[in-house]
Every structure is written in structure tokens, then in C-alpha cells.
Amino acid sequence: MPTRLPTLTDFPTSLHLTITPPPPSSPQLTNILILLHGLGDTSASFTNLGKQLSLPETTCISMQAPTPLPFELGGFHWGDDIQFDQATGNMDFDTGFSKAIKILKQEVIEDCLVGKCGYKHREIMFFGFGQGAMAAIAAAASMNEELGGIISIGGLLPASDTSAKAAKTPLLVLGGSSNTLITKTAITNLEASFQNVEYHRWSKAGDGMPQNREEMLPIMRFFARRLKSRKGVPGGSVEIG
């Protein structure tokens, strides 16, 4: 069992993050959910998400990507570099994740959550959107330990991933029915790097965040399976059908 909740002073001062403790009705310290925003966003939106989820026995940590976007574009990014697609003019999601891996794997998980607070790897989960999901996938793929899981909305396996063996961490991937990055090739690549990949295809177009109960249902089912509980899930806290 973890010895205590993490505090802001446990983390390097270079990291910008917020910590949302478990609901008062669930005082046990059991799980950590690390929330990673998408390209060009900040941690604020996922801080609100953590509060809205209100998962029992779960502390939510919303992290801000380490590097601001250039040219007064606003927001932050998880990549090692900034590149633009010459055909579309859009920013490339996949520009290397060595910096993000170091932050997530070493500074956050190993040094703070495991080393200082006594959490087990199995008690730590990721929820990532877009480029944030790719950062989570890259970090988990580089680890020998099994984490609680990754929920990836529109996140791919980074091209830079060179893992020699499939990671143990279970992965839930969600994407739209059209205009999506989650193609058959993307799933095949993920299945080559992770032992357990579950794919849910939404009926809507695009890889946006879930907007209703139907779109949230596979996520809540994944939480129900993978979040640890020392006294059971309180009625109504996690809707599974």
C-alpha cells in the first residue's frame, strides 16, 4: 500500500502539474491516474477532467507538457522537436519522445511515486489524448514493469519506439470511425509492442474526447477492470453498464 499521497514538493520544480486527491468518501490511497493533454493544450483541461471523473481511491495528476509551442501559438507539446507537415501545414505529433520518457518514467514514476510515496507500478495508470497519449505509450513501452494501464485517445506508437519485447502494460485505444489516426496499421504496430491491446472504434468521426455516456462506457469499463480497490467500488462511482 502507498505510504502517502504525492505532493507538489515531491516533484522537480521544472514540472508543472496539479494533484487532485481521491473523493472524501474514499480515503484509501490506492491508485494514481496520470493525465496527459494533447498537442497545443495545457494541463488545465485535464485537471478539470480528473475532478469530473472522481474515481474512488484514485489520485489524479494532470501534467503539463514540458515545452511551449513557438511563435506565440500558445499551449505546450510533448515532443523532442517541432516539425510541420509541408503538405498540410499542421504540426507533426511524432517528433521523438526521449524527453517525455525521461520525465514520465524516471522523474515522475520511479523517483516520486514509487521511490518517495511507495506506490507499486501496477497502481499507476495513464490517460492521454493525442500527443499526450503517444508520450504515455512511449514511456510504458520502455519499461519492464507492468503499469495499471493506458487509455489512449487518438494516440499512436511513436516511430522512434525500438522496444525489443512487448510491454506488459494493458492498453485501451480509442478512435473515430473516420478521419482518424487509429488505422489497422496503427493497431498492428501497437500489438507488436504491447502484449494486451484493446481497440474501441467510436461511431463518430475524428479522435476527439468522449462527449457522452456511450463514448465513455469503454473507458469506465477499463477503469473498473484495472483500478485497484481495497474496499470495493462504491455504487454509482464507476458506471459499467
Segments and roles (model prediction):
Residues A44, T180-A186:
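Conserved alpha/beta-hydrolase "acid-adjacent" motif
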Residues K184-G241:
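C-terminal catalytic histidine-bearing segment of alpha/beta-hydrolase fold enzymes
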Residues Q64-P68, L156, A205:
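Short beta-to-alpha linker loops that shape the active-site pocket of alpha/beta-hydrolase fold enzymes
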Residues R122-A167:
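Primarily recognizes the serine-hydrolase "nucleophile elbow" in alpha/beta-hydrolase
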Residues A159, G176-I182, D207-M209:
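Acidic catalytic loop of the alpha/beta-hydrolase fold
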Residues P2-H121:
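Serine-hydrolase catalytic machinery in alpha/beta-hydrolase-like enzymes
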Residues H37-L39, I124-F129, G176:
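Conserved alpha/beta-hydrolase "nucleophile elbow" surrounding the catalytic nucleophile
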Residues A167, L171-G175, N179:
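Short beta-strand/loop motif that positions the catalytic acidic residue
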